[in-house]
């Protein structure tokens, strides 16, 4: 699986066991992601942070 880094022009290949890509936003500003990468389990959203997870190459 290949996931985009913070700047989507760059990506990385995920290590074994991390089979989801994710994008994290501040709830107050959903237009600008603050973090992207590989993850094993999609975190729950909080009052401050929103996560979007997916499982295809460069989907984040």
Curated annotation (Swiss-Prot):
InterPro entries according to UniProt: Cytotoxin_Cobra, Snake_3FTx, Snake_toxin-like_sf, Snake_toxin_con_site, Toxin_cobra-type
Cellular component, GO annotation: extracellular region; membrane; other organism cell membrane
Subunit relationships: Monomer in solution; Homodimer and oligomer in the presence of negatively charged lipids forming a pore with a size ranging between 20 and 30 Angstroms.
Pfam families hit by this protein: Toxin_cobra-type (PF21947)
Compartmental location: Secreted; Target cell membrane
PROSITE patterns xref list: SNAKE_TOXIN (PS00272)
Keywords recorded for this protein, A-Z: Cardiotoxin, Cytolysis, Disulfide bond, Membrane, Secreted, Target cell membrane, Target membrane, Toxin
Organism: Naja naja (Indian cobra)
Keyword Membrane: yes
SUPFAM superfamilies: Snake toxin-like
Function statement: Shows cytolytic activity on many different cells by forming pore in lipid membranes. In vivo, increases heart rate or kills the animal by cardiac arrest. In addition, it binds to heparin with high affinity, interacts with Kv channel-interacting protein 1 (KCNIP1) in a calcium-independent manner, and binds to integrin alpha-V/beta-3 (ITGAV/ITGB3) with moderate affinity.
Name of the protein in question: Cytotoxin 1
Claim: Secreted is one of the keywords in the record: yes
Top-level taxon of the source organism: Eukaryota
One example of a Gene Ontology biological process annotation: killing of cells of another organism
Tissue expression remark: Expressed by the venom gland.
Coiled-coil region: none
């Amino acid at each position: 699986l290949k996931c985009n880094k913070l700047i989507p022009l760059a990506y990385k290949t995920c290590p074994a066991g991390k089979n989801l890509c994710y994008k994290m936003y501040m709830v107050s500003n959903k237009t600008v992601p603050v973090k992207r990468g590989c993850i094993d389990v999609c975190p729950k959203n909080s009052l401050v942070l929103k996560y979007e997870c997916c499982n295809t190459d460069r989907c984040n």
